[in-house]
Design a protein with these regions (language model features):
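A structural micro-motif
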Residues: 1, 30, 83, 103, ...
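N-terminal beta1-alpha1 cap of cysteine-dependent amidohydrolase-like domains
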Residues: 1-77, 183-186, 190-230
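Short, well-ordered, mixed-charge alpha-helical segments that flank or form enzyme active sites
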Residues: 12-13, 61, 94-97, 114-116, ...
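Conserved beta-strand scaffold positions in the cores of enzyme catalytic domains, especially
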Residues: 32-34, 107, 135-137, 172-174
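Structural motif
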Residues: 50-54, 86, 174-176
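Cysteine-nucleophile active-site neighborhood
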Residues: 56-127
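Pocket-forming structural segment of enzyme catalytic cores
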Residues: 101-166
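A glycine-centered loop/beta-turn motif at secondary-structure junctions
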Residues: 161-197
Length: 230
């Protein structure tokens, strides 16, 4: 299994890199390719099983878009060919039409608007397929997109225009949920690995599932989640 982690030096703002550390620990002989700025992405000339990018400071988003723009058609081709993509935090905004007046890759019909006077922080409980997904959001930007919903919001906040959160198209998974999403949601991690058709052993059992059950029970106990903004 080959994972390409794009621009890991700037796209692990909330510890998102632990998604890849955990995923790679579950699969024998997993190779992680780290692509930095001004390097040709590995996916351009080689087969990869998963392309990953995590949360970043807003000032780096244009740099990331500029780096990926020459490979836009290749990225679209890989998405259509069902290569797996996982984008956490504001990384998903890169693939939309725009972030304010910054032109995005325009792969998905989404638009993000920043509001630096309104830093959103909240817990999240949602549903994908028959799985409950727990997580956390922290962002200055708000996305409008009514196509290809990933998760249905049960408690918390999704996209601006409805009760959905994230983008799911073919094997592209993009969500505003930050940090070690895969550690927090071992059920989704297992689902992802099964979809990728690789041999795996979910690490740190039963601790990760016990922690998930405790967090899920806690989240279910709240009537709703409030937004903390500063």
């Amino acid at each position: 299994m080959i994972i390409e982690y794009l621009y890991s030096d700037v796209t692990s703002l909330y510890g998102d890199n632990f998604n890849i550390k955990y995923l790679s620990s579950c699969v024998k002989n997993c190779e992680v390719i780290y692509t930095n700025f001004n390097e040709t992405p590995y996916f351009v000339d080689h087969k990869v099983d998963l392309i990953y990018m995590g949360s970043m400071m807003e000032r780096y988003q244009k740099n990331v878009i500029d780096q990926l723009m020459p490979y836009k058609e290749k990225i679209k081709e890989l998405i259509e060919d069902n290569t797996f993509f996982l984008m956490t935090g504001n990384a998903l905004e890169v693939f939309g039409n725009n972030i304010d007046d910054i032109e995005g890759l325009k792969i998905f019909d989404s638009s993000a608007k920043r509001d630096y006077s309104h830093h959103h922080n909240s817990c999240f409980l949602g549903k994908y397929d028959d799985m409950r997904i727990v997580g956390f959001k922290s962002c200055f930007s708000y996305t409008t997109c009514d196509k290809y919903p990933f998760m249905q919001v049960e408690k918390g906040f999704g996209f601006v225009n409805g009760g959905n959160e994230g983008i799911k198209y073919n094997n592209f998974y993009g969500t505003y949920l930050i940090g070690p999403l895969l550690i927090l949601n071992p059920n989704f991690t297992e689902y992802l690995l099964k979809q990728m058709n690789v041999e795996y052993k979910l690490e740190y059992q039963p601790t990760v599932k016990d922690a998930y059950d405790i967090r899920l029970k806690e989240f279910e106990s709240y009537k709703d989640f409030k937004e903390f903004k500063h």
